[in-house]
């Protein structure tokens, strides 16, 4: 993208997603990540959009106005986006590619976090770490992150999520929310993911495309692996091959679900051919219920 195209796309995302950003912030965003184990900091007067469960009823009764409790994480929380920029992100057969879906979802979540006065940071990776932006607050910073995300042209093509998480780990001095946006077609990241998830909120956003889940019966086709450059000719008219492909996909999904659960991370699947607003809102509602039950 040219700088002018990037600016237009940033503005488009801001305009078309502003209601979603508002709904995320006004809904369960804060309570979905600030549940147990937070440190009390102070009380302040209630403001529209505050979680009513944080109202300090003793102070409210004494002063005759609604006051809420604030916690340390409300002022110290960082939201980090670990974004897979490998070549497989260029695949998409519906509304957008996986990479475009990941970029827009990361932009929406970054805008929501900025509106919540959280710090925003990012790390982009392929088979190497290619970009690392330290967390900071402010509209200018979040717009820089989104612009960099949209304009980024990676040097690598492969995927090494383990290397990305290993570089991130020593920089995490305070509790953080970490969104990992990837198709997770990688290995060797399990241990470092578990270490990070023990101290931080880790959410995997699994970016998928329907054609990666089910092959059409289109006869002989040539498939290309964008990360390795390998070509393979297959007969998609073979029902047994298509069934095997579908089974392998299901096995991959179950394995990823199990891995995330065992390592203490959360997981949400987002598909290139479907709107992502409701899945995001449902995810925050589900996390909120789990933390406050």
What are these regions (language model features)?
Residues 53, 75, 141, 157-160, ...:
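Helical mechanochemical/support elements of P-loop NTPase systems and associated helical scaffolds
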Residues 141-176, 188, 209-211:
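Von Willebrand factor
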Residues 1-139, 167, 177-180, 186-187, ...:
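An amphipathic, basic-hydrophobic helix/alpha-beta surface used to engage anionic
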Residues 180-181, 272:
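Small/polar loops that bind or transfer phosphate-bearing groups
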Residues 100, 155-162, 247-250:
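Conserved phosphate-coordination/catalytic loops
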Residues 1-32, 42, 51, 167-174, ...:
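Von Willebrand factor type A / integrin I
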Residues 132-148, 285:
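Short, electropositive alpha-helical surface patch
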Residues 104, 108, 159-166, 254, ...:
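Short, contiguous clusters of charged residues that form electrostatic/catalytic patches at enzyme active sites
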């Amino acid at each position: 993208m040219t700088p002018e195209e990037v600016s237009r796309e940033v503005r488009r995302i801001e305009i078309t997603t502003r209601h979603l950003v508002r709904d995320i912030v006004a809904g369960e965003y804060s309570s979905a990540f600030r549940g147990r184990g937070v440190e009390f900091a102070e009380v302040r007067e209630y403001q529209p959009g505050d979680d009513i469960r944080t109202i300090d009823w003793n102070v409210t009764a004494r002063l005759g106005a609604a006051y809420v409790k604030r916690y340390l994480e409300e002022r110290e929380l960082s939201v980090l986006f670990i974004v897979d920029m490998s070549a497989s992100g260029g695949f998409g057969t519906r509304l957008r590619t996986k990479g475009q879906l990941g970029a827009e979802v990361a932009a929406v979540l970054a805008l929501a976090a900025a509106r919540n006065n959280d710090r925003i940071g990012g790390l982009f990776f392929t088979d190497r770490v290619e970009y690392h932006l330290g967390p900071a607050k402010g509209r200018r910073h979040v717009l820089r992150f989104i612009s960099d995300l949209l304009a980024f042209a990676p040097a690598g093509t492969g995927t090494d999520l383990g290397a990305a998480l290993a570089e991130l780990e020593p920089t995490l001095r305070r509790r953080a929310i970490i969104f990992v946006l990837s198709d997770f077609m990688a290995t060797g990241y399990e241990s470092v993911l578990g270490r990070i998830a023990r101290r931080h909120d880790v959410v995997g956003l699994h970016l998928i495309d329907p054609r990666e889940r089910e092959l059409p019966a289109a006869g002989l086709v040539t498939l290309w692996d964008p990360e390795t450059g390998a070509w393979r000719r297959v007969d998609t008219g073979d029902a047994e091959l298509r069934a095997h492909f579908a089974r392998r996909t299901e096995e991959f999904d179950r394995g990823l679900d199990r891995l995330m659960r065992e390592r203490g991370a959360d997981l949400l699947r987002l598909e290139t051919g479907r709107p992502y607003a409701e899945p995001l809102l449902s995810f925050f509602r589900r996390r909120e219920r789990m933390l406050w039950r």
